[in-house]
Amino acid sequence: MSGVKFNIGKIVNTHGIRGEVKVVRITDFEDRFDPGNTVYLQDNKEYKPLVIATHRVHKGFDLLQFKGYGNINEVEAFKGLMLSIDEDQLTDLEEDAYYYHEIVGCKVVTSEGEELGKVKEILSPGANDVWVVQRMNAKDLLIPYIEQVVKQVDIENKIIKVQLMEGMLD
């Protein structure tokens, strides 16, 4: 187990009396919640390993039950806490796909070499992700993650080259 953890969901409530918790998922990989998988409950600075016993989706939420926790009273204290996975549980992505933590913090430059700022967050409003670039002395710039705009992503050097469309800086 490495020391680096990645958040995959937040427990927002309990569900029923048999120890299920309601989770808002913040991962694209539903299989992170497969029964038998280990996730980590972040409580203060401690990470407590929990093994998933059951998983189902109900009204847009992931409902999880953990092995050894069969009663609402045992999971009540989990409300509001984050679920994480270990770095070695990350899976390889296909080409031109990146984990958010790889993109956030990257410097964004135009094809001409003009520095625009750094990616501070990623939005997922619909068909494609939108990278929010924090600029110096200017309002944030929204960069759609599409081929026409994002030309090169260099994760190793944390640099993203873009070709801005007309009106993007307005």
From Swiss-Prot:
InterPro entries: PRC-brl_dom (IPR027275), PRC_barrel-like_sf (IPR011033), RimM (IPR011961), RimM_N (IPR002676), RimM_N_sf (IPR036976), Transl_B-barrel_sf (IPR009000). GO terms for cellular component: cytoplasm; ribosome. Residues 95-168 form the PRC barrel domain. It holds the Pfam family PRC. Keywords: Chaperone, Cytoplasm, Ribosome biogenesis, rRNA processing. GO terms for biological process: ribosomal small subunit biogenesis; rRNA processing. It is found in: Cytoplasm. The PRC barrel domain binds ribosomal protein uS19. Binds ribosomal protein uS19. An accessory protein needed during the final step in the assembly of 30S ribosomal subunit, possibly for assembly of the head region. Essential for efficient processing of 16S rRNA. May be needed both before and after RbfA during the maturation of 16S rRNA. It has affinity for free ribosomal 30S subunits but not for 70S ribosomes. PANTHER family: RIBOSOME MATURATION FACTOR RIMM. Belongs to the RimM family. This is Ribosome maturation factor RimM. It comes from Oceanobacillus iheyensis (strain DSM 14371 / CIP 107618 / JCM 11309 / KCTC 3954 / HTE831).
